[in-house]
Amino acid sequence: MCSGVCICLLLAMLSASSKAHQATGSLGEDAVGTEMDQLNLSQLPRYARASSAGQKKSFQRTDGDQRSNIGNALVKYLQQSRKAGPSGRYVVLPNRPIFDQSHRINDRDYMGWMDFGRRSAEEYEYSS
């Protein structure tokens, strides 16, 4: 539950920051707005344009490092969620029972749910 709340807060923060970024982008038509945009771009090197290929590669490495950090965090989260399965938390890969593959209705995705027409098809043998 705590992880769900954290994810919701993270998404709310990201959407708020993107809305704020769009609002500051609309000021770019007048001279004051463009000066503010240039000031912001000079302070954030990630958004600055690279004049040579060497600088461009260094920015790509930073993005790659961030992606690997996010990937590592995701792997750790998935491992923790798998370990915490019996405690009542959501299990990422549930243990599903194995069914007979030769049965004529072999795709049983809806365990415990009545899929329309399937139950009646299992109960009655059709002669045709």
From Swiss-Prot:
Name of protein: Cholecystokinin B
Underlying gene: cck-b
Subcellular location(s) of the protein: Secreted
Family per similarity comment: Belongs to the gastrin/cholecystokinin family.
Post-translational modification: The precursor is cleaved by proteases to produce a number of active cholecystokinins.
DNA repair listed as a keyword: no
One example of a Gene Ontology biological process annotation: digestion
Molecular function as annotated in GO: neuropeptide hormone activity
InterPro entries: CCK-like (IPR015499), Gastrin/CCK (IPR001651), Gastrin/cholecystokinin_CS (IPR013152)
Pfam family for this entry, one: Gastrin
Leader sequence residues: 1-20
Sequence intervals crossing the membrane: none
Keywords of this entry: Amidation, Cleavage on pair of basic residues, Hormone, Secreted, Signal, Sulfation
Alphabetized PANTHER family for the sequence: CHOLECYSTOKININ (PTHR10786:SF0)
Tissue note: Brain and gastrointestinal tract.
Residues with Phenylalanine amide modification: 116
PTM annotation (Sulfotyrosine): residues: 110
CC per GO annotation: axon; extracellular space
Top-rank taxon: Eukaryota
Keyword Secreted: yes
Annotated stretches, region: Disordered: 47-67
